[in-house]
């Protein structure tokens, strides 16, 4: 079944029918956190972050530490790492997960760290360019909803990393294997990216991490917010809080929103374009429909399709110029057709 509700211009809600577990069990994987992975290419707005990682990892070896909240509690977790855009195959020496400690945002609580492994039990592995890798970890006891996780990814080829989500947590990078260290002794928030001009927003790049799922009861599901900068904020968290305050504990609310994202065309502009993501009609499958346990999707998109062609620094990307020969200024009919495309995909 499909329920559509157009609440305002460029906004709609889609409701998917519940899906049974693949193995027929009473539990299934449900997203507790999600990030839309982008290409932080050298010629994008992200060269500072890339060069910082390269300089800190002189030998290519270093640890990414990522702090993210989980919207669902549980014991057994699955984490998806990506290498869609890296400059080559990535070698990962170790991945650990633990609870955030009380001594700062990047600290991990003593005695909570566990090692994540692939489905065949390997703690070290490679991720081919263009591929993903799932790793699994379990805590001795179930952790409560709203817990903050500290994820450590020790990468022996860190200079090749180009996959980053832009929102939903905080990240640091430090030379060497510090996966078991309680605190960072040489704090390097190298994955922070400040806008190069006014109005583009600041980011905290989250490397390699696309999704964290938890094994949950059959009636638990994920809600996805997907769209542009109008929902890269606290709106998903506010909904999550309101649900929990009203006794709803079997639903997560995760975000697939990207600042500057458009419905019909990939990001415009040489510097900011790669960090505005693929057209929503292109990324909808991966960033919404394939999110584990998804049953409800809120879409807020279309404003940038209208506004970007009017901006002096971007207009040439929409007039079929040499900058982007296939760029065009969308009509109302084309935008409506884009919404219909999303409905058809559902």
Where are these regions (language model features)?
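Hydrophobic core
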Residues: 4, 8-14
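Conserved SGNH/GDSL esterase-like catalytic core that processes O-acyl groups on lipids
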Residues: 33, 63-66, 89, 95-104, ...
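A structural motif corresponding to the C-terminal end of an alpha-helix
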Residues: 341-346
């Amino acid at each position: 079944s499909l329920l559509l509700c157009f609440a305002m211009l460029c906004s709609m809600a889609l409701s998917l029918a519940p899906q049974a577990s693949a193995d027929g069990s009473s539990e299934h994987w449900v997203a507790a956190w999600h990030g839309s992975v982008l290409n932080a290419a050298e010629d994008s707005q992200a060269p500072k972050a890339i060069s910082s990682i390269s300089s800190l990892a002189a030998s290519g070896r270093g640890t990414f530490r990522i702090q993210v909240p989980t919207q669902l509690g549980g014991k057994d977790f699955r984490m998806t790492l990506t290498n869609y855009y890296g400059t080559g195959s990535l070698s990962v020496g170790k991945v650990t997960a633990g609870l955030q400690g009380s001594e700062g945002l990047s600290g991990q609580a003593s005695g909570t760290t566990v090692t994540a492994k692939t489905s065949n039990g390997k703690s070290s592995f490679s991720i081919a360019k263009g591929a993903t890798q799932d790793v699994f970890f379990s805590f001795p006891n179930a952790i409560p909803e709203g817990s903050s996780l500290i994820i450590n990814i020790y990468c022996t080829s860190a200079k090749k990393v180009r996959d980053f989500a832009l929102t939903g947590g905080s990240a640091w990078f430090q030379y060497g294997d510090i996966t078991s260290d309680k605190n960072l002794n040489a704090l390097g928030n190298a994955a922070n990216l400040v806008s190069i001009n006014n109005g583009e927003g600041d980011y905290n790049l989250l490397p390699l991490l696309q999704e964290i799922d938890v094994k949950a009861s059959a009636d638990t599901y994920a809600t996805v917010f997907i769209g542009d900068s109008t929902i890269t904020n606290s709106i998903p968290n506010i909904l999550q809080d309101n649900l929990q305050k009203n006794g709803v504990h079997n639903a997560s609310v995760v975000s697939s929103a990207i600042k500057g994202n458009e419905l019909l065309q990939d990001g415009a502009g040489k510097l900011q374009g790669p960090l505005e993501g693929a057209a929503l009609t292109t990324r909808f499958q991966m960033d919404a429909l394939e999110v584990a346990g998804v049953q409800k999707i809120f879409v807020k998109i279309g404003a940038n399709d209208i506004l970007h062609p009017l901006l002096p620094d971007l207009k040439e990307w929409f007039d079929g110029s040499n900058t982007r020969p296939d760029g065009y200024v969308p009509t109302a009919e084309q935008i409506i057709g884009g919404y219909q495309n999303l409905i058809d995909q559902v």
